[in-house]
Amino acid sequence: MRRPMIVLAACALALLPGQPASAAAPWGPLAPPNPFLGPPGAATMHGDAGSSDVTALAGPAAAGAVAAYPLASACPTLLEGSDRLVVALCTAIAGQTPTVYLLDPAAPGPLAASLAALPLTRGSLLGGVYAYLDQVDRLVVVDGTDRLLRIRHERDATGTWRLVSEAFADLGPVLPPGDAVTGLVPDWSGNVWFASGQGVAGFVTAGGQVAALILPAGERVANSISSAPSGQVAVATTHALYELRAAASGVPEIVWRAPYDRGSARKPGQLSWGTGSTPTYFGPRTGADYLTIVDNADGQVHVLVLRSGTGELVCAAPVLGEGGPGSENSPVGVGRSVFVASTYGYPYPALPEGAGPAVPPSAPFTGGMTRVDVDGDGCRVVWENTVRSAAVPRLSTADGLLYTVARVGADHTTPLDGYAFTVLDPETGAVTAAQHLPGTVVDDPLQTAPLITQDGHLLQGTVIGILRVG
């Protein structure tokens, strides 16, 4: 998923019987944890440095109590620290001010408040969405003045929680006027890598020095970025997939570039003309053998699997044949398996600047998900379904289930559509449980990622705050 914050902010103007998940070999392996991140599976929007959208924490599995955090803010970024407190990066409805909230995920329901809040300087509406928790539970984020911030939470003498921001580096000198950072991730050496909308990529060293390069003209970065234990950092632009690394000379360098089919135009349900994927590291040997994205080819789209380190195309497979041919979401990747959800036709109420017209201008949201496995013969489609996923799916290796929120209603969407917490068996793609959530358009997650907490709750950002299941 890319830049859900502005899209969410703009939108602010029954348990079903099923079969239990089938017994299967454990999912994995996952890449080793990044030592400069917080708890694995909960420290980045997509769970980890490799953007796997996989967690080793068990989710609610079935029906549970639903509580709400009504924050009057759109909240796409939900992260949990080692202290079991949640840090949320949101956009306030009033003024669209980026705001950091500190939350207790176990607060009594049905309504809960934040423990502390800290507004950030507003800049480009496209910046400041992706952030992460570092190894001491500080939120690392870039504000509207291009400052790299570290935000810690602490209690004062009265026991009141507060959020404290410290500037670590200024990225302004390496960014063009009007540009904004769209992705952040640490590598395994402690460098903080970033990528900007206008195609600047680089890193900040542990000492605060900034080094950057400019990707080819006309290529924009509309997703976050990912890193692997090998030291490689993956960046997907609107034209190509890259791996970068820090050279011995102390500057970023391109390891390889692989163009993909970006199609002839932006598709309805996507936010830019190109892939909607944050690159996902996965693989059967190290957990980061491969990289995967979904292309934007006209008509049928494809999962592309490339080898990390070389950029060799391992295989490609057509996906989302049962639903809409396009995905704004990052794939889920674990072991030999990739899971993709369609967003084709999803009714985003606003688009980022420069998104361009969609062709066709609109389409029904039919949904659909696909699982693809990589084996010695290439890519193989294991299953497809018609689940209308309205969030980035999250796979739990602890309980062997795939979690999302589904949109409920006709394919031609309306503000009266509902939403359902939905659990799937990743072996078959079958829905094992679903629970309707309260509300209609105000509870639209708009294809943002959920958080599974250490206590087994699932938190999902919405247009006006956060819902908690379990």
Regions found by a protein language model. Give the residues of each.
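Sequence/structural signature of beta-propeller modules
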Residues: R2-L8, A12-L120, L126-V129, Q135-R138, ...
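Repeated scaffold domains used in trafficking and secretory/extracellular systems
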Residues: P70-E80, P119-Q135, G172-V185, G218-P229, ...
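Conserved beta-propeller blade signature
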Residues: V86-A88, R138-V142, N191-A195, Q232-V235, ...
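Loop/turn-rich, solvent-exposed surfaces of beta-rich toroidal or solenoidal domains
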Residues: C90, D289-D295, E328-T440
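Structural motif
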Residues: I93-D104, T145-A157, Q198-T205, H239-R245, ...
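Surface-exposed loop and turn segments in beta-propeller and other repeat-based domains
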Residues: S114-G123, R162-P177, E253-S272, A316-G324, ...
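Asp-box/WD-like beta-propeller blade repeats and closely related beta-sheet repeat scaffolds
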Residues: L115-G127, T145-R147, R152-S189, S196, ...
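Blade-level signature of beta-propeller repeat domains, shared across WD40, Kelch, NHL, RCC1
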Residues: D444-G470
